[in-house]
Amino acid sequence: MANMEREPILSARDVEISFSLRGKKLNAIRRCSLDLYQGETLAIVGESGSGKSVFTKSFLGMLDANGSITGGSILFEGKDLAKYKTEKDWMTIRGKKISMVMQDPMTSLNPLKKIGRQIEESIELNQGIKGPEAKKMALEMLKKVGIPDPERRYQQYPHEFSGGMRQRVVIAIAAACHPQILICDEPTTALDVTIQAQIL
């Protein structure tokens, strides 16, 4: 079926994003649009600093405190995400329905918590599953992203992992709740080519 005959699961139209800096408004994104369909992989391509990450973070309410959506619409499940204002609003979709793999795993992981616990927390928060079942799912995700000896790694902290291994953990956390949309911000940068192909 052609895309024109289907409804996109996410439709962004003429999105504009600005940041306040020293009393001035800086326009970071001007009139960006896209349609994403079920089962589709969509790449956003642009030079470094062109606003790719800022644009996609707006789908999750993850802009910096001085940033805001100042124009356009982001339609998802019949609602305009561009109108969401509170953290309570965003928590209804973030992780559960739309999730994101960040570019830098060290800024995504809590250095004071064990890896297994961090995956479990995502499962608990977004699926309401706790205890042994959550642990079982966390271990399964570690296996899926190619982490050897998951039982041992489950008990370790982020600093005990290489950059590539941390990247895999971040992917496991984002994918653990089987979101409808998984946004990946250069998710395989720290991985070797074999694992890159497997993850993608």
Which stretches of residues belong to each language-model region?
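Conserved ABC transporter NBD signature motif
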Residues: 69-80
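Conserved ABC ATPase signature
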Residues: 156-161, 165
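The feature captures the beta-strand-to-loop junction immediately N-terminal to the Walker
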Residues: 45-46
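Conserved ABC ATPase "signature" region
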Residues: 80, 133-152
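ABC ATPase NBD coupling module
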Residues: 81-99, 117, 125
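A short, proline-enriched helix->beta-strand linker immediately N-terminal to the Walker B motif
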Residues: 176-180
